[in-house]
Swiss-Prot record:
Similarity field: Belongs to the globin family.
Gene it is expressed from: HBB2
Organism: Torpedo marmorata (Marbled electric ray)
Tissue: Red blood cells.
Domain of life: Eukaryota
Cystine pairs: none
Protein name: Hemoglobin subunit beta-2
Domain (Globin): residue spans on this chain: 2-142
InterPro entries according to UniProt: Globin (IPR000971), Globin-like_sf (IPR009050), Globin/Proto (IPR012292), Hemoglobin_oxygen_transport (IPR050056)
Length: 142
């Protein structure tokens, strides 16, 4: 998957207009609720999976930092996510399908936040972003 210059611009525009940590925490809460098996790696959260809970918020900070770095350097997402991919594969044992589930949850949260501004063009650009991120996070699995 590759992003056009217009899509890169749209992604950076979207990301600059949202509270990144809040959107990320809401996306994580949605994943944990809709796909409960994804909570198995987060036993330290003690079954507290709301966006406002400390464990979710702290993880949202880490995820949002990684996504912000990716969005800031869209030409090198695979390279920049290589170590994170290795960590998710070897240390954490994350199923790669979970990355796309989180991407889908982000799309819902972005659409809810942006409302009428979340045009089909924004949707396509954001979807492609999360496909790129999913590919990058999955690269060490192959």
């Amino acid at each position: 998957v590759s992003l056009t210059d217009e899509e890169k611009h749209l992604i950076q525009h979207i990301w600059s207009n949202v509270n990144v940590v809040e959107i990320t925490a809401k996306a994580l809460e949605r994943v944990f609720y809709v796909y409960p098996w994804t909570t198995r790696l987060f036993t330290s959260f003690n079954h507290n999976f709301k966006a406002s809970d400390k464990g979710v918020h702290d993880h949202a900070v880490n995820v949002s930092k990684a996504l912000s770095a990716a969005i800031g350097d869209l030409h090198n997402v695979n390279k920049n996510f290589s170590a994170l991919s290795t960590k998710h594969q070897k240390k954490l044992g994350v199923d790669t399908s979970n990355f796309m589930l989180l991407g889908q949850a982000f799309l819902v949260e972005l659409a809810a936040f942006e409302k009428d501004k979340f045009t089909p063009q924004y949707h396509k650009a954001a979807l492609k972003l999360f496909e790129v991120v999913t590919e990058a996070l999955s690269c060490q699995y192959h």
